[in-house]
Amino acid sequence: MSAAAVILFPFIGILLLSQISSYRISSWLNTLFSFLSFVGSLFLLFKKDPPGSFFLVDELNIVFILLTNFIGFTTALFSQRYIAHEIEIGHLSPPSLRFYHSMYQALLFGMNLALCSNNIGLMWVSIEMATLSTVLMVGIYRTTESLEASWKYFILGGVGIALALFGTFLFYISARPTIGEGLAAMAWTNLFSHAAYLDSSLVNIGFIFILIGYGTKVGLFPLHGWLPDAHAEGPTPISAVLSGLLLNVALYAILRFKILLSANPHALQAGPLLTAMGLASVLFAALMFYKRRDIKRLFAYSSIEHMGIISFAFGIGGALANFAGLLHMSMHSLTKSAIFFAIGYISQIKRTQKIADLSGLTSSHPVLGWGLVFGVLAIAGLPPMGVFMSEFLVLSSAFARSPLLAACLAVGLITALGALILKLVQVSFGEPRGDSSPIRSLYLPMFSHFLLVFAAGVYIPPRVVEWFQHCSVLLK
């Protein structure tokens, strides 16, 4: 099974699910196609095809592909009960259900195509496709707030993708004198092998546009404006895949271009730019936590913080920092998506996302309440969770490079920790408020993620360590 499989399954899903209005059948088919994509990604661990004109699979993008398709599958599983409840209470209709499931598969199709692509132009098109899918799903409720969030996402995302397109074009122009015209000058494999000969002035300008353009998709400060609204107003499964997956895909694009700069002796150093944007994102998000009143907005800002940590790590560079960045990306994706699984059911039960109205969850709904406690403690970076391990490694590598930068990052992490604990106490403990009626829930996706995050904090298999170390070398 080749990279084409993880692209083919969601493509078939788009065509089929757009024709099915039964939510029971369509939700199971959505889960089935997502599962098949995940199985296809597992096969890539054991058999990697040689690079072709359009597809490239190496140890680096397999990390992203596997993570994307695992969380894509578990989120589809979570969506079954969540979307069924939205249908039952009249928030969604059968036509919108067809749209939701076909767009969900379009999102997976776009992300997988971007990650498997051996062409800088095809990557750009794929990320734009994935973005448009989520833009449409954010506005699926057709409320004033959701349409406004969707429009804001579309405008800011459009600006970002336009800048990324211009940056991509500059890299293509820089490669033509050495590689030649056409698709050859757009292939990652050719660009990697000729990186030292690319026009450094064009490459430098191009990377600035790439960083700003794709950085908008990552949600880095000050390009984050779309992210809190999109998380708060869209369906919770989309919040989970936005935070857990799509932000990673945009960061992957930045990292691929960063590798090209690292191999060019005359190009600028991309690391300090990425470090600065990452640190600014952490500090900004940490301060904004204290003012949040909506629980989904709170964790949207948490995503800004953690994408900042990941960017900071890759900006610092070196074997340890790159390893820590990959580990933190994996832990954040698993933890944050699981938190949104819990929040999705909680908001349906309580019929609100206001933090002030969600108190006493550990008493009224112990499974969800304590699950949220676990998730918040994990995402806050407390031991023995995997996030603690990755943050410790990021700080260690930063202290070795620049104690001042490490101290600034530590201040941001401690500030964020205090805010999250404060909000956790408000939500999980105290006198229960609001509706406590049970709804049909599926906890397997949430607890499977938490189990992996806990296990990674206790023991990482040597094979995984070796894999991430090889990826760290690719990232230089």
From Swiss-Prot:
GO terms for biological process: ATP synthesis coupled electron transport. One of its GO terms (molecular function) is NADH dehydrogenase (ubiquinone) activity. It comes from Methylacidiphilum infernorum (isolate V4) (Methylokorus infernorum (strain V4)). This is Hydrogenase-4 component F homolog. It is a multi-pass membrane protein. One of its GO terms (cellular component) is plasma membrane. The chain crosses the membrane at residues 1-21, 25-45, 54-74, 120-140, 153-173, 202-222, 235-255, 270-290, 307-327, 368-388, 402-422, 442-462. It is found in: Cell inner membrane. It is an enzyme of class 1 (oxidoreductase). Pfam families: Proton_antipo_M. Keywords: Cell inner membrane, Cell membrane, Membrane, Oxidoreductase, Transmembrane, Transmembrane helix. Its EC number is 1.-.-.-. The gene is hyfF. Belongs to the complex I subunit 5 family.
